A protein has these predicted regions:
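Mid-chain, structured segments of secreted extracytoplasmic proteins
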Residues: 66-111
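Surface-exposed edge beta-strands and adjoining flexible/disordered loops or tails in beta-rich
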Residues: 60-62, 149-152
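Exposed beta-strand and adjacent loop surfaces of beta-rich binding modules
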Residues: 42, 61-63, 84, 130, ...
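Short acidic/polar N-terminal linker immediately downstream of export determinants
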Residues: 5-54, 69-77, 107-122, 185-203
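Short, surface-exposed interaction patches in beta-rich subdomains
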Residues: 28-38, 65, 143-144, 152-153, ...
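Repetitive beta-strand solenoid architecture
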Residues: 39, 48, 58, 92, ...
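Flexible glycine-/small-residue-rich
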Residues: 47, 66-68, 100-102, 125-127, ...
């Protein structure tokens, strides 16, 4: 009898753990940031969870809309969770760093609560500036950038629209598990380790994309 009771309690505990997040709703809080940024400068992004939209424009300025997204049972319960996410913007002009900080991890439960916290970014940056981006879990969209790009994503999809194929010097896109698609030469590959590469000695722009699990899509911006 005691064994059966223990089994029922364990089953209920597991069921509660699985269903708990499903009962929560999403709440969000939006903040905006801006800083001067010059052509051919470098924007470095370090993000853990959340989607990232980046668009190039003809302005010497970096504008960021950061949406903190949390899962909670009510709006009141969501308010203290926003404080667990910190958006840090450092530097200006030639070098800018954007980071998302999470609460310190504990050794006995290193990922506790992280699934409830994310930051989505919408970014406008000089079209001829350079980008270095690292994201653990999230989708990335990049459009209208002519500078160098280095994109590393663990879990998610990356979509890049290339403004000018003539200016593209090199493209390397690789997924450890997933798919890679490009309309530059009609390439479409999937499975384990798909990759595509492109080289034009007269071009100027270099793009390097690496995804652990997900997809890479490279298109002409028409």
């Amino acid at each position: 009898m005691a064994w059966k009771t223990k089994w029922v309690l364990v089953s209920l505990w597991l069921l509660w753990g699985l269903c708990g997040p499903a009962r929560a709703d999403e709440f969000s809080q939006v903040s905006r940031y801006a800083v001067r940024m010059f052509s051919y400068g470098l924007l470095t992004i370090d993000s853990r969870m959340g989607d990232i939209h980046i668009e190039g424009w003809d302005e010497p300025r970096l504008e960021i809309e950061a949406e903190k997204v949390v899962r909670a049972k009510s709006e009141e319960a969501a308010k203290p969770l926003y404080k667990n996410l910190t958006v840090i913007l450092e530097g200006k002009d030639k070098r800018v760093v954007l980071r998302t900080l999470y609460p310190p991890r504990r050794m006995w439960r290193p990922f506790r609560g992280e699934a409830r916290l994310a930051v989505n970014y919408r970014i406008k940056m000089p079209f001829d500036a350079n980008l270095a981006l690292r994201c653990v879990d999230g989708d990335v969209w990049i459009r209208g950038l002519e500078g160098k790009q280095r994109i590393l994503v663990n879990y998610g999809d990356v979509e890049i629209d290339i403004p000018s194929v003539d200016r593209l010097r090199s493209l390397y896109a690789h997924a450890w598990l997933g798919y890679v698609q490009s309309d530059l030469h009609g390439e479409d590959r999937g499975g384990f380790g798909p990759r595509i590469s492109f080289w034009n000695p007269t071009g100027e722009q270099d793009i390097y994309v690496k995804v652990r699990m997900g997809g890479v899509f490279v298109y002409r911006d028409e």
